[in-house]
Amino acid sequence: MPHSSHTQQTKTHEAAAGYSPRLCNDDLAPTRDQNWSWYNIFSFWMSDVHSMGGYVVAASFFTLGLASWQVLLCLLVGICIVQLCANLVAKPSQMAGVPYAVICRQAFGVFGANIPAVIRGLIAFAWYGIQTYLAANALMLVLLKFWPSLASLTSSSFLGLSPLGWLSFATMWLLQAMVFWHGMNAIKRFIDIAGPAVYVVMLALAGWIVYKTGLDGISFTLASKSLSAGEQTWQMITATALVVSYFSGPLLNFGDFSRYGKSMGEIRRGNRWGLPFNFLLFSVVTVVIVSGTQSLFGKMITDPIETVSRVGNDLAVAIGLLTMITATIGINIVANFVSPAFDFSNCAPQKISFRTGGMIAAVGSILLTPWNLFNSPELIHYTLDVLGAFIGPLFGILIADFYLIKRGRVSVDDLFDDTPQGKYWYRNGFNPKAIAALLPSVGLGLIISFIPTLHEVANFSWFIGVFLGATAYRWLARDEREVQAKAAFRSGAVAQ
């Protein structure tokens, strides 16, 4: 069971039998298996960073017209902000041993928590389908390279996908489902291997490129344009904000994983190695590879799949492509599968288990036909920007509630109490103050996202959302904060 001087905890795991069945099942109840070490958290972040999307994003920062030291400074500052936020959001879930959807009951109410849970689940749901499609494309490249005769299966189309495309998508879908179906321990073992495996391939690829081009063929400034001092300053601020925004999704539901941490010390150590150290190393290796492609192939290639496919040795190509596919499976599971599994389970615990919630997302990803979504960037923009406008305010409200209002305390039993006597019952299971803080904060985020003249400001929408959500909730819940402060004074407890 989780243990903390600030956690009013259940006596044993069997006490879950006394929890409301409308709020609890074996997957949502406080876990007894808090056995994740710093390395497991480190591997989680490796799986999140080491992806085709992460590769393209890391390379893009070096095309902004900034000097290499400026880019690295932006990456360092941005990822340190992510590290700080990860430490903050990890604590309540680690203390209580519950996932993100359950800890949200503190701020939104035992039923109101379904609002942030479903929002995060839908975001992950959409990205899960898109990432599976990208992995399927990589698999299709492998198949066509070694069996060119399969090209005949790409000539026709059904619902926007060729027969070979369907075969590849189904294969990736099943592989991910197999890992997920065996539970969190299988996921932990998978990401422990996936992250380091990508490093082996990337370092080998970087070494091959340096061998082919020589050190003179490597440049840490990939842009051809030059910027004024003012433009450089603005680009640096923007780049820093984009780093944080890139991690905003998995950051919000990091509690789904921190709940398994042995201690906050282990989690902080894992975050330190998995974020600043890992992200900077990955970015440097990425830019070595990308800049080398300019010298080696005559054009800059930002797609790792295309770069690997140009290596002369067939065995090396196969290993490289399969590792990239593994990396995509890794990020898809940790960022886009686990989240909806817990989030959808939270909506109807007795009807939807962790497995069922995950399979809802998996089946839904097929019905979404993500290849059609991916081929319509405007539709992706509008769909995900609308959902993304919620992420900043949700994070701000969650953090403000735990640290400023609840003063670092969690009443675990009350997270599963659906009676009016429960601390998190509020008004019929919903906290009107949290909802009132969320709606205008999201509304402003949507305005920023969809007004073209505010395009530059949109890069900071996560920060704006966090500030608005936290500030509005802090003000609306000021009476509760005073009550909590008096209770803490009477008990002699000091919030950390």
Model-found features: residue ranges?
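Hydrophobic alpha-helical segments and their helix-loop junctions in multi-pass secondary transporters
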Residues: 132, 136-145, 197-224, 246-247, ...
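Transmembrane helix-boundary motif of multi-pass solute transporters/channels
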Residues: 18-108, 112-115, 125, 249-276, ...
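Hydrophobic, membrane-embedded alpha-helices of multi-pass small-molecule transporters
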Residues: 38-54, 168-175, 206-213, 224-287, ...
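Transmembrane alpha-helical segments of multi-pass small-molecule transport proteins
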Residues: 144-181, 196-205, 236-254, 277, ...
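Membrane-interface loop-to-helix entry segments
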Residues: 119, 130-136, 167-209, 222, ...
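Membrane-interface "cap" regions at the ends of multi-pass membrane proteins
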Residues: 1-68, 202-206, 212-215, 227-240, ...
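C-terminal membrane-solvent junction of multi-pass transporters and transport-like membrane proteins
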Residues: 394-475, 486-490
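Selective recognition of specific alpha-helical transmembrane segments in multi-pass small-molecule
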Residues: 53, 77-85, 119-131, 196-211, ...
